A protein has these predicted regions:
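C-terminal motif of bacterial Sec signal peptides marking the signal peptidase cleavage site
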Residues: 13-17
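Short Gly/Thr-rich strand-loop-strand
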Residues: 104-142
């Protein structure tokens, strides 16, 4: 009887150890907004100092215009963090966006239109900035975040921001 009881306890412990771990809780839009702003600020490079991250659209401070310039609509996004230059002297923009339900393609199309516009703006103007715009990265991360990086050294900036978001 003792052996049977010990065996039952051992099997229970063994099987409970094999159970899958619960998935990490989904972050709220507010938590994602904070995460995106911090990831871009910490890893976005020098240009973030001159172009602070915005995370809400307001008419009075130009952030609504910046969203429009980036091809984004507030209703297409559940959360976002964006740093971009409103002056057309450098090809620069970083956007981390959690699309609203069913809006991933709209977000990606908007950001791709921003990339295309920047390429066109710099094609005959500043060759080095045209190269930056042409090398922009736009991808959807494992957690559903759409990340666009157009900046000097975009690959390392993209990887750093991506890592910060996925580990956040």
């Amino acid at each position: 009887m003792k052996k049977l009881l010990a065996f039952a306890v051992a099997m229970t412990l063994l099987l409970s150890g094999c159970a899958s771990k619960p998935a990490a809780a989904e972050k709220t839009p507010e938590e994602l907004t904070t995460l995106y702003a911090q990831a871009i600020t910490d890893n976005g490079g020098e240009m973030v100092e001159y172009n602070p991250v915005i995370s809400e659209a307001k008419e009075e401070d130009g952030s609504a215009f910046l969203l429009e310039m980036m091809g984004l609509k507030a209703e297409d996004m559940a959360a976002f963090g964006i740093s971009a230059s409103m002056m057309n002297v450098q090809a620069y923009g970083i956007a981390a966006v959690k699309p609203a339900e069913g809006k991933e393609e709209a977000v990606k199309e908007g950001l791709q239109s921003f990339i295309d516009m920047q390429k066109m703006n710099f094609e005959f103007y500043l060759a080095d900035q045209y190269e930056v715009a042409s090398s922009a990265r736009l991808e959807t991360l494992e957690d559903g975040t759409v990340l666009m990086v157009m900046a000097q050294d975009q690959d390392s900036v993209f990887e750093s921001i991506s890592k910060a978001i996925l580990e956040g």
